[in-house]
Regions:
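Membrane-embedded alpha-helical bundles that constitute the cytochrome b-like, heme-associated redox core
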Residues: 1-177
Length: 177
């Protein structure tokens, strides 16, 4: 059986989120891990852009989860073994969880540091918690852990999609195109 495509709405949400999550992840990584502390102006600028675009992920993942809760995804092609089907669905669930927890912990962290969370240069998200010098770094660690886990799974997801297309030459990637 050739796989059927996902409907337009989940395909658009998938690619829109990819177009936001990948640069947001890279900006956070560069600002947090590559730039030296002495480059505070550049770090501040990159983290500002990171927050602007990453905050929209909260809205998009809620829309995506709502769609997923009310619509069944198409079946994978018959050529995909059962163990890979189970693994794909389990990893998809974990990725959904991380796409929710990563921006939420970022939002919580910003709130705990007393910073506003801008959304696409048009507004701000309300603080989720009050300022807390004690909680902010702990939430920051949770945000970093969640972001790293999401980054690893995203990389694996991309590699798996490319292996399906160019290695196995099946129609799995076509489902989301």
């Amino acid at each position: 059986m050739k796989a059927s495509r996902y409907p337009l709405v989940p395909r658009v949400l998938h690619w829109l989120m990819a177009a936001i999550i990948i640069p947001a992840w890279m900006l956070g990584f560069v600002a947090g891990r590559i730039l030296p502390a002495s480059a505070s102006g550049s770090r501040h600028l990159l983290l500002g852009v990171h927050r602007e675009i990453a905050s929209s992920i909260v809205i998009l993942i809620v829309l995506r989860l709502a769609w997923r809760a009310t619509h069944r995804p198409p079946a994978l092609p018959d050529c995909v073994p059962e163990d890979q089907r189970v693994a794909a669905r389990a990893l998809q669930c974990v990725m959904y969880l991380l796409m929710l927890t990563t921006p939420l912990t970022g939002w919580l962290m910003s709130s705990a540091y007393g910073k506003t969370v801008p959304v696409l240069w048009v507004g701000h998200l309300p603080a989720l918690i009050g300022s807390s010098e004690l909680a902010a770094p702990v939430i920051g660690v949770a945000h970093q852990f969640s972001a790293w886990a999401l980054g690893v799974l995203m990389f694996g997801h991309i590699i798996a999609a490319l292996l399906h297309r160019f290695g196995r030459r099946d129609s799995v990637l076509d489902m989301m195109l």
